[in-house]
Design a protein with these regions (language model features):
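Intrinsically disordered, low-complexity regions enriched in proline, serine, glycine
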Residues: 3-6, 31-36, 59, 72-73, ...
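Short, compositionally biased
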Residues: 78-93, 166-184
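Hydrophobic, well-ordered secondary-structure elements that form the walls
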Residues: 117, 153, 176
């Protein structure tokens, strides 16, 4: 992060690296350390609203700079095996651990504003794995950062990914409406 708590210039939004923030093991000041962004919580103001055709959505109520932290995808952490047993898989976020057990975040019953952010084939948010209190690679925080400048009133969206659409295309298609849409029919 830079001195304004923004991801540094040159951050790779197409293949984001993991971020390890300072924690209680560091000697830094918890209130003034620039490497404690996600753990300070949401600062960008957003609004949940009813969309046309896509249920709920989220829009920005303030300008958000490229690289700015917007929100964290939170919910119940469950194993992939448990996720397979659940009937409603609409709010699952796969944590994609390459080694050992795999888990996901289920925001169906427990979550925040982030669960209402819709898919976009031209996303303005990028999910980034962030570690704050530990370094257990199975359990990252999923932080949403602005992948470009976001203006007040812009609709927030991130790419749900091909794995999501392989499963869901049987039930619905993408409604982003963009010419370069990857997942409509």
């Amino acid at each position: 992060y830079d001195s304004n708590s923004i991801l540094k210039e040159g951050f790779d939004f197409s293949d984001p690296p993991m971020i390890f923030e300072c924690n209680d093991m560091c000697g830094c000041n918890i209130n003034s350390c620039n490497n404690r962004v996600v753990q300070h919580g949401i600062t960008a103001r957003t609004q949940v609203y009813k969309t046309y055709g896509m249920g709920w959505g989220v829009k920005a109520l303030v300008d958000i700079p490229k690289g700015g932290f917007v929100c964290e995808y939170v919910g119940e952490i469950i194993s992939d095996a448990e996720a397979e047993q659940r009937e409603n898989d609409s709010y699952l976020f796969d944590l994609e651990n390459r080694d050992g057990d795999t888990f996901c975040i289920d925001a169906n019953k427990f979550g925040n504003v982030t669960r209402f952010i819709n898919h976009s084939c031209d996303p303005n948010l990028t999910p980034v794995k962030v570690f704050t209190a530990h370094q257990d690679l199975r359990f990252p925080h999923i932080a949403m950062f602005a992948s470009r400048e976001i203006k007040k009133g812009d609709i927030l969206g991130f790419d749900y990914g091909e794995k999501f659409w392989v499963i869901k295309h049987k039930y619905f298609t993408c409604w982003c409406g963009l010419e370069k849409c990857k997942y409509s029919k």
